[in-house]
UniProtKB/Swiss-Prot annotation:
Ranges that cross the membrane: 15-35, 66-86, 89-109, 147-167, 179-199, 210-230, 237-257, 303-323, 353-373, 386-406, 410-430
Keyword Hydrolase: no
Localization terms from the record: Cell membrane
Protein name (Swiss-Prot/TrEMBL): Uncharacterized transporter YflA
Length: 471
């Protein structure tokens, strides 16, 4: 069994190296070109239609508000990858990995935008009156390939079990180390609290994440901003360190062993993609339930999600780790996951360590909450509502098993399982790219949407190119 797990881990490491990085990066570039670089052409408009519309009555039909859909999607992306994944990228790829993480985030916006657009376009209303959608629906309805939609759903249901076990292990260990709780009891308590939320369905999850996500993300980014203000003189040095190491091999410094340019690019791309989940098909499940008058309008919210997750939260972690100097510590490479805690302790003493532990708990708990919802929707798609109720308890049990230590042997299994949801989803995105472009063109050339919004604010419109209009 041990040899099998080692074999699986080697395969996972290889797949999450060049193969998937090339696939996802290529897809991001393709959609960026296809949609004429919309994320660069309409940044202010996108911001006004998302963050700028908070507090206004949503347009169109849906189950949850656009903000609740975003916070639900962010709950599954803002987590351990932001706190422990970024230091790992720095230790194994060097400071320059941060640049490549930023770069891939810009192209990943086009992937997540396209996922959400298709999810809303092909969504359905279930027996309870809730809007449901995601890859399983746009694969089945858009491509008329139900077998592939079923494959995606089954793969996601299976993948979420080790994912939840790993997350359950992370939060229980954090509570045990910080507050001396028993790990198993901590797992049971977390499972109970999460159960109270997920049993209430998408509306309750939306209400909880709408409160928790802005609070926890704001607190973490706020702490990072405070450190920036305490170290304003270090800001130019931070950017210099990142850019000077982005295009050359990084030399060894202290506990940092150095990194070849290829490793710098690989770690930056991999951590960026892993953090924002572009191409994985999970976030569109949340966005499909949003109240909106057009799929493209909800797609803008997924773009903002990457801004918050990668460009703000991950950058906050990167600055703190690099500015504090902990990445050059004697034994830094032995445990990159501990660098964020060490960096906060560098500035705030023991209180900084408690802050990171509490942040990690909130991040992980909200992640588990939402991924259980994703699994429930897959079970309902395959077998109906009763199966959705059953799978909730399977996932809640996985939290407790993970808390007991059962997750340690399946990290490789988790990464391998992710491949089986990424590949069919990306294939579907590419095959449905003409539909994405048609919806994009419709939104930006119709008098009902973009042109109407621009006239209200008396802004000069930015029209799609002739090629887009004629598509």
């Amino acid at each position: 069994m041990e040899r099998l797990l080692v074999w699986i881990e080697h395969i996972s490491d290889w797949l999450w190296g060049p193969p998937l990085i090339i696939l996802l990066t290529g897809t991001g570039l393709y959609f960026t070109i296809l949609l004429k670089g919309f994320q660069f052409r309409y940044p202010l408009y996108i911001f006004k239609q998302t963050i700028g519309s908070v507090g206004k009555k949503p347009k169109g039909e849906g189950t949850v508000t656009p903000l609740q859909a975003l916070t639900s999607a962010l709950s599954s992306t803002i987590g351990a990858a932001n706190i422990v994944g970024v230091p790992a990228a720095i230790m194994f790829g060097g400071p320059g990995a941060v640049f490549w993480m930023w770069l891939i985030a810009l192209f990943a916006m086009a992937i997540k935008f396209s996922e959400s657009v298709l999810a809303v376009h092909y969504r359905e209303k279930n027996e309870q009156g809730e809007y449901v959608g995601g890859p399983m629906y746009y694969i089945t309805k858009g491509l008329r390939m139900k077998w592939l939609g079923v494959f995606f759903s089954v793969a996601l249901i299976v993948e979420l079990i080790p994912s939840i076990m790993v997350q359950g292990n992370s939060v229980s260990v954090s509570l045990a180390e910080t507050f001396s709780f028993n790990k198993i009891y901590a797992g049971i308590g977390i499972a109970f609290l999460i159960g109270l939320v997920v049993i209430g369905g998408v509306k309750r999850i939306g209400k909880v994440t709408e409160f928790v996500v802005p609070l926890m993300a704001g607190a973490y980014a706020g702490a990072g901003l405070l450190i920036v203000l305490m170290n304003l003189s270090s800001v130019p040095a931070f950017f210099s360190l990142v850019f000077s190491n982005a295009f050359t091999s990084s030399s060894a410094v202290g506990g940092f062993a150095g990194a070849a340019l290829a490793e710098t690019v690989r770690w930056g791309f991999a951590r960026g993609l892993y953090s924002n989940e572009a191409g994985m098909g999970t976030a569109p499940i949340a966005h499909a339930a949003a109240m909106t008058d057009h799929p493209v309008r909800q797609g803008f919210w997924s773009v903002i999600g990457i801004v918050i997750d990668t460009l703000i939260i991950c950058t906050t972690t990167a600055f703190i780790v690099l500015a504090s100097g902990v990445w050059t510590g004697k034994n830094a490479s032995n445990d990159p996951a501990a660098l964020t805690t060490a960096a906060f302790q560098h500035y705030f003493g023991s209180g900084g360590g408690y802050f990171v532990s509490v942040s990690l708990v909130f991040f992980v708990v909200s992640t588990i909450m939402v991924v259980i919802f994703y699994g429930v929707k897959q079970a309902e798609f395959l077998f109906g509502r009763l199966a959705g109720h059953v799978i909730k308890f399977v996932y809640l049990a996985a939290i407790i098993i993970g808390a007991a230590g059962g997750a340690k042997a399946i990290w490789g299994v988790l990464d391998l399982a992710l491949v089986f949801i990424v590949v069919p989803n990306v294939i579907a995105l590419l095959l449905l790219s003409r539909k994405v472009k048609a919806l994009y063109t419709e939104f930006f050339t119709s008098e009902q949407y973009y042109l109407k919004d621009i006239r209200k604010t008396k802004q000069k419109p930015v029209y799609p190119t002739k090629e887009a209009k004629n598509s």
